[in-house]
Amino acid sequence: HAVFNLVRLSVPLMKDGGSIINTASVQSKKPTPNILPYGATKGALANLTIGLAGVLAEKQIRVNAVLPGPIWTPFIPAGMDEDSVESFGSQTPMGRPGQPVELASAYVMLASDTASYTSGTLLTISGGAVPL
C-alpha cells in the first residue's frame, strides 16, 4: 500500500507535467520460484505504474517504472550463499551483474524532458536478459 498511498498524497501537490518513477524488477515478469512474494509485489507495482499512467495522463503526469535485472549491491553477499554470490548475474547475456551506476541514466532520462511523451513504460535494465 505504501506506493499507492504515497502517490495518492503527492499527486495533489505535483505540478502538471511531473514525473513518477517506480522501481519494479524483472522478477515482475518472470519470477524466480524461491522469491515468489518479491516477484508478486514487483508485478503489482508494474501494473500500478501502467494503471496510474492512464489515470494521471490528463494532468500530464508521467508514470514509468525501471525494471532492474541482477544489480550488484552490498545486500547481495549478505543474503546469499558463497556459490550464489559468485554466479550472481552470470546468467545474463552480458555474463555479469549490473552496477547501480548503470541504472542511473534510466532514471535521469525518465525524469527529464527527453521523456516528455513517455508514460506507462516498464524500462528493463538487465544486461540483455529479456523477461517474458
Give the label of every model feature segment.
Residues 29, 67-78:
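Short, flexible catalytic-loop segment of classical short-chain dehydrogenase/reductase
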Residues 62-72, 111, 124-126:
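Conserved SDR Rossmann-fold cofactor-binding beta-strand/turn motif
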Residues 25:
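Residue(s) in the substrate-gating loop at a strand-loop-helix junction
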Residues 17, 30-36, 58-59, 95, ...:
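Active-site loop immediately N-terminal to the catalytic Tyr-X3-Lys motif
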Residues 7, 41, 49:
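Active-site helix of classical SDR
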Residues 92-103, 114:
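A conserved structural motif in NAD(P)-dependent oxidoreductases
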Residues 12-13, 54-58, 116:
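Alpha-helical segment proximal to the catalytic Tyr-Lys
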Residues 30, 107-108, 119-132:
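Short C-terminal tail/terminal secondary-structure segment
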